[in-house]
Curated annotation (Swiss-Prot):
Residues where Phosphothreonine is found: 15
Species whose genome carries this gene: Rhinella marina
Record's protein name: Sodium/potassium-transporting ATPase subunit alpha-1
Chain ranges on the Extracellular side, renumbered to this chain: 109-131, 309-320, 793-802, 867-918, 971-985
Basic and acidic residues bias spans: 1-11
Binding site for Mg(2+): 717, 721
Region (Disordered): 1-34, 215-235
Taxonomic placement: Eukaryota, Metazoa, Chordata, Craniata, Vertebrata
Sites bearing Phosphoserine, chain numbering: 16, 943
Localization (cell): Cell membrane, Sarcolemma
Length: 1023
């Protein structure tokens, strides 16, 4: 386990500060490969004399102030180089010109071009194109600002998280202790740390007293690690004499020499590794790109075909170019950009209410397409608090209550042995509750002390009342603190129980060491000699609890003889003058960081949703496996190679790995695997746990999953997780326990640190993908009744049935609210029962969606519009036969005697009023047929009658579009502003039959879909 490049003094990876050529292909790849290697350094193997020579530090007086200033000038401040951030204007431009916006910009430019051509050629300049260009530009700018504002809001929340680095450090220079800003600590400085401090740089410990550090942000180990001057392991991350930058000292004191500062620390290397990783495009960005290709393809194909056709029909070049531009622009769904942005924003808000903060909108959908989740164990799957799980006394195992709300099992507390055990656990314990928490529930209280002692303290407080009172009654007179050589902690107390001796000795520690010091055992409150049978019982209990992945402690006591130890006896803990052997064994207590309540259910949900959950942890394999079984990552009945070997009683190497569905892989084994071996494991095992892994390995695991084609979500809270968070398709950081570095690297933050929230997020992501399909299907359908009038106008030479301004009224007016309302649609079936979508096959917009929207529903809609158009012209005297070829005379403002079918003559003004009335009627017809389209788009497979009309926003959308259409048609002054004229009430009904036809047609199609799944109707029309 470890990080780093194979050099004693490791260089930081290239960042802009160090003149590295970032982003220059080969060099950068090489740097990243360097960073992925494990750390090697020699400092932990050196003697104090060698350290003194290497760093020139006096081991008692420290550096001189002058020398420290020189080193500071040479190495720069002891701080992490901030990751290169994207300037705000670049972010803004991305929103304005990225993806879909580009399509609209091209449309706008083409409009201005068409307007310019008409103006220059002195044809009657028609201002429609100018308006259209302006409106398109406005749409892009407004939605761009909106998306930018959304993301800026999330990044402001991020800014508020920055407070990772330690502020002050205690150094010794010229023999004096100085408190200086941690940024000014230099290599070779002599530094002192005490409980509660953050380690200011990578230190080589030269002296320590009971020092423990919390390395969880670096290695993921939840237990505090002892620090001492002893060289205990070749691996710098495992040895006791190195303390790492930005980890916490939880108790004791230590003095050390700074061996690395800033970016050269182990933590600094990880941060550099994270900031250098490139995240790819999000799945939804890929989808939108694909969609733009389709739309552009259709537009250009239609435009060019009709350009050639209009030349064949003897139009002038100039007119043909204007037609070409007109058709391309008519194909652009102006309202869709806004719809997609609003839909994603709504989902992001909904997720925020469910404790998922999404940093960029596109991540919303990515979570929905996730097929593998690599989850951290501590704090995400578990509660991140050690809790007493089992006890062994009176020769049987009792289960304690580990639930968060104390609703679980309780055990028999009447046995006198339990009273004795609880007394030892409370007295032989240095953990305390800080004052002022009397009204806080016991389990929620803060504790000063290490994780195991806190667990014991809370357990005894819950079962037996105030531990503080117990300690006050049984006053402590002597103590030997825990140390790594004797592996026990002992204290002597004045005994408050008058029926026993004056002094009570209590001891706890590693079970086998405690048992060795005992000659008797307490059963039902009576002392009995410790025979082989009882020793076996102890051994079995110890193995059983250890096998559950729990941390087991043994407890014993001794009532000291009143004659030997009279009142006021002076206990000497240096030269021990009291017995520490021949004690009475009382029992075992085992602790575990228990799983969160909702996790097993959610892991099951992931499994039925086809999502593979992999546990990646820095913890012990036994503990990791126990928790994996507890939360269902390894499901009941599935065995690992070790389980099979134990069952068949054969060596592990004789088991075929393919026989085991589950596997637990140790970090050290992972270190020696090549990419093919990792791929083999990921491919052939469904349930995988990686234990004792380093951050680099987490990154390698993520890359392995991505090679399999998986879309990977990774959760993490430590700095150690940030490279993997950055590399994953979606990185999920923890809001409560997460370090700032991990929050910076992630795409999403879980505000309650709970795995269950991820699954909620997956559900929301899948739902928005379905609903976006529906929104797009709805929006695209009206494109056909908008384009066909223009095409028929060119081919049949008839008066224009639908004008540009009216098209805008549909796309940016009546269609907007209904399209957005589909984002609120409920899921049709259980979304979490289907496999994750395959990004290569299952597209947001596919050929089937286009064929439904353009080829089927859209065509029926166009018929409805034309029907209204011909009805109005016929009522005014122009029968369809008269209209063919009438266009040139109709458009000429100097011809005032165009004859209708009845021989009446029409002036230019009168003709135009009839034409604009037709535009209005065509517009209203599209609104009427879009009612049916909105209702059929609610579902893709179910009948609307099964789904019901529960979506209130959608019902509002139906009324809103109708009200808006009526307003535009009847409001005084609209004839001047938008050239819309009032309609006779009967003309509203022209499109009703077509609306009904659409509804019936689609209900029948969905019925066939449900009756014969996988049939040709599904293959051709299910989008």
């Amino acid at each position: 386990m470890g990080y780093g490049a194979g050099r004693d003094k490791y260089e930081p990876a290239a960042t802009s500060e160090h003149g590295g050529k970032k982003g220059k292909g080969k060099g950068k790849d090489r740097d990243m490969e360097e960073l992925k290697k494990e750390v090697t350094m020699e400092d932990h193997k050196m003697t104090l004399e060698e350290l003194h020579r290497k760093y020139g530090t006096d081991l008692t007086r420290g550096l001189t102030t002058a020398r420290a200033a020189e080193i500071l000038a040479r190495d720069g401040p002891n701080a992490l180089t901030p990751p290169p951030t994207t300037p705000e204007w670049v972010k803004f431009c991305r929103q304005l010109f990225g993806g879909f916006s580009m399509l609209l910009w091209i449309g706008a430019i083409l409009c201005f071009l068409a307007y310019g051509i008409r103006k220059a050629s002195d044809l009657e300049p028609d201002n429609d194109n100018l308006y259209l260009g302006v409106v398109l530009s406005a749409v892009v700018i407004i939605t761009g600002c909106f998306s930018y504002y959304q993301e800026a809001k999330s990044s402001r929340i991020m800014e508020s998280f920055k407070n990772m680095v330690p502020q002050q450090a205690l150094v010794i220079r010229n023999g004096e202790k100085l408190s200086i800003n941690a940024e000014n600590v230099v290599q070779g400085d002599l530094v002192e740390v005490k409980g509660g401090d953050r380690i200011p740089a990578d230190l080589r410990i030269i002296s320590a007293h009971g020092c423990k550090v919390d390395n969880s942000s670096l290695t993921g180990e939840s237990e505090p690690q002892t620090r001492s001057p002893d060289f205990t392991n070749e691996n710098p991350l495992e040895t006791r004499n190195i303390a790492f930058f930005s980890t916490n000292c939880v108790e004791g004191t230590a003095r050390g020499i700074v061996i690395n500062t800033g970016d050269r620390t182990v933590m600094g290397r990880i941060a550099t590794l994270a900031s250098g990783l490139e995240g790819g495009q999000t799945p939804i960005a890929v989808e939108i790109g694909h969609f733009i290709h389709i739309i552009t393809g259709v537009a250009v194909f239609l435009g060019v075909s009709f350009f050639i056709l209009s030349l064949i029909l003897h139009y002038t070049w100039l007119e043909a170019v204007i037609f070409l531009i007109g058709i391309i622009v008519a194909n652009v769904p102006e309202g869709l950009l806004a719809t997609v942005t609003v839909c994603l924003t709504l989902t992001a808000k909904r997720m925020a209410r469910k404790n998922c903060l999404v940093k960029n909108l596109e991540a919303v959908e990515t979570l929905g397409s996730t097929s593998t989740i690599c989850s951290d164990k501590t704090g995400t799957l578990t509660q991140n608090r050690m809790t007493v799980a089992h006890m062994w006394f009176d020769n049987q195992i009792h289960e304690a209550d580990t639930t968060e709300n104390q609703s679980g099992a309780s055990f028999d507390k009447s046995s006198p042995t339990w009273t004795a055990l609880a007394r030892i656990a409370g007295l032989c314990n240095r953990a305390v509750f800080p004052a002022g928490q009397e009204n806080t529930p016991i389990l929620k209280r803060d504790v000063v002390g290490d994780a195991s002692e806190s667990a014991l303290l809370k357990c005894i407080e819950l079962c037996c009342g105030s531990v503080k009172d117990m300690r006050e009654k049984n006053q402590k007179v002597a103590e030997i603190p825990f140390n790594s050589t004797n592996k026990y902690q002992l204290s002597v107390h004045k005994n408050a129980n008058p029926s026993e001796s004056r002094y009570l000795l209590v001891m706890k520690g590693a079970p086998e060491r405690i048992l060795d010091r005992c000659s008797s055992i307490l059963l039902q409150g009576k002392e009995q000699p410790l025979d082989e049978e009882l020793k076996d019982a102890f051994q079995n209990a110890y193995l059983e609890l250890g096998g559950l992945g729990e941390r087991v402690l043994g407890f014993c006591h001794l009532l000291l003889d009143d004659e030997q130890f009279p009142d006021g006896f002076s206990f000497d803990t240096e030269d021990v003058n009291f017995p520490t052997e021949g004690l009475c064994f009382v029992g075992l207590i085992s602790m575990i960081d228990p799983p969160r309540a909702a996790v097993p259910d959610r892991v099951g949900k992931c499994r039925s949703a086809g999502i593979k959950v992999i546990m990646v942890t820095g913890d012990h394999p036994i503990t990791a496996k126990a928790i994996a079984k507890g939360v269902g990552i390894i499901s009941e009945g599935n065995e690992t190679v070790e389980d099979i070997a134990a069952r068949l009683n054969i060596p592990v190497n004789q088991v075929n790995p393919r026989d085991a569905k589950a596997c637990v892989i140790h970090g050290t084994d992972l270190k020696d695997m090549n990419a093919d071996q990792i791929d083999d494991i990921l491919r052939h095992h469904t349930e995988i746990v990686f234990a004792r892994t380093s951050p680099q390995q987490k990154l390698i695991i993520v890359e392995g999953c991505q090679r399999q084609g998986a879309i990977v979500a990774v959760t993490g809270d430590g700095v150690n997780d940030s490279p993997a968070l950055k590399k994953a398709d979606i990185g999920i950081a923890m809001g409560i326990a997460g370090s700032d570095v991990s929050k910076q690297a992630a795409d999403m933050i879980l505000l309650d640190d709970n795995f269950a929230s991820i699954v909620t997020g997956v559900e929301e992501g899948r739902l928005i993908f379905d609903n976006l399909k529906k929104s797009i299907a709805y929006t695209l359908t009206s494109n056909i009744p908008e384009i066909t009038p223009f095409l028929i106008f060119i081919i049949a030479d008839i008066p224009l049935p639908l004008g540009t301004v009216t098209i805008l009224c549909i796309d940016l007016g009546t269609d907007m609210v209904p399209a957005i309302s589909l984002a609120y649609e409920q899921a049709e079936s259980d979304i979490m029962k289907r496999q994750p979508r395959n990004p290569k096959k299952d597209k947001l917009v596919n050929e089937r969606l286009i064929s439904m929207a353009y080829g089927q529903i859209g065509m029926i809609q166009a018929l409805g519009g034309f029907f209204a158009y011909f009805v109005i012209l016929a009522e005014n005297g122009f029968l369809p036969s008269t209209l063919l070829g009438i266009r040139v005379a109709w458009e000429d403002r100097y011809v005032n005697d165009v004859e209708d079918s009845y021989g009446q003559q029409w002036t230019y003004e009168q003709r135009k009023i009839v034409e604009f009335t037709c535009h209005t009627a065509f517009f209203v017809s599209i609104v009427v047929v879009q009612w049916a389209d909105l209702i059929i788009c609610k579902t893709r497979r179910n009948s609307v009658f099964q789904q019901g009309m529960k979506n209130k926003i959608l019902i509002f959308g139906l009324f809103e579009e109708t009200a808006l259409a009526a307003f535009l048609s009847y409001c005084p002054g609209m004839d001047v502003a938008l050239r819309m004229y009032p309609l006779k009430p009967t003309w509203w009904f022209c499109a009703f039959p077509y609306s009904l036809l659409i509804f019936i047609y689609d209900e029948v199609r969905k019925l066939i879909l449900r009756r014969s799944p996988g049939g040709w109707v599904e293959k051709e029309t299910y989008y």
